[in-house]
From Swiss-Prot:
InterPro entries from the UniProt entry: DarP, DarP_sf
Record's subcellular location: Cytoplasm
Sequence similarity: Belongs to the DarP family.
Record-given protein name: Dual-action ribosomal maturation protein DarP
HAMAP family listed in its UniProt record: DarP
Superkingdom of the organism of origin: Bacteria
Function, in words: Member of a network of 50S ribosomal subunit biogenesis factors which assembles along the 30S-50S interface, preventing incorrect 23S rRNA structures from forming. Promotes peptidyl transferase center (PTC) maturation.
The keyword Lyase is annotated on this UniProt entry: no
Lineage: Bacteria, Pseudomonadati, Pseudomonadota, Gammaproteobacteria, Aeromonadales
GO molecular function: ribosome binding; rRNA binding
Gene Ontology terms: cellular component: cytosol
Pfam families cross-referenced by the UniProt entry: DarP
Species for this entry: Aeromonas hydrophila subsp. hydrophila (strain ATCC 7966 / DSM 30187 / BCRC 13018 / CCUG 14551 / JCM 1027 / KCTC 2358 / NCIMB 9240 / NCTC 8049)
């Protein structure tokens, strides 16, 4: 099969290559990204879903997707494609921002809980020095209660008893200073 050959100079002079827009592969990647975003939205809890700015049609599609949930079902896959198609005709930037806020909130909560666990370990292992440092940062804590929990947790550890005071200390710290971390 022979085609019409044009001299290379014609391609260099014309700007026809620039007017073509995104490639077919790029359009497919964009569609798959929107479909994955739709899957993330469908998997959110109801309270998180309320924070996502969805118009009525997209919200109905997401609710239906939540009902179709079985991931091995072909209808669920097709419905995710439908959600992606709906999102292609909308400004998805507010949706992306809301999703990132939700994701960051989860990581922030995990970091706070991890810091509480570190404080608990330091209190049990270092004793009064860690307690004094904690009290200097958080004045509202009950020093006597913390000392009692530290002593009890150390005794439980020595006697190989269940870590009741260990857990109680974590709950106390979480209740008193979680919002301040």
């Amino acid at each position: 099969m022979t085609g019409i050959k044009r001299p290379m100079s014609q391609y260099q002079d014309d700007n026809e290559w620039e007017d073509w827009g995104p490639s077919k592969s790029q359009l497919k990647r964009d569609a798959e990204a929107l479909q994955k975003m739709g899957e993330e939205i469908v998997s959110l809890s109801h309270s998180e879903l309320e924070k996502i700015p969805l118009d009525e049609e997209l919200a109905e599609a997401v609710e239906l997707g939540r009902k179709l949930k079985p991931k091995k079902d072909e209808s669920f896959r097709r419905h995710l494609q439908f959600i992606g198609r709906l999102m292609r005709s909308r400004d998805v930037e507010p949706i992306v921002e809301a999703l990132s806020i939700i994701k960051n909130r989860h990581s922030t909560v995990n970091a706070r809980l991890h810091r509480l666990e570190q404080w608990r370990e330091r209190l049990i292992n270092e004793g009064d020095s860690a307690l004094n440092e904690l009290m200097s940062q958080f004045h509202e804590l009950d020093r006597q209660k913390l000392r009692q929990l530290i002593r009890t947790a150390n005794k439980e550890r020595e006697l190989n008893k269940p870590p009741v005071a260990y857990r109680e200390m974590y709950q106390y710290l979480r209740g008193e200073i979680e919002d301040l971390l």
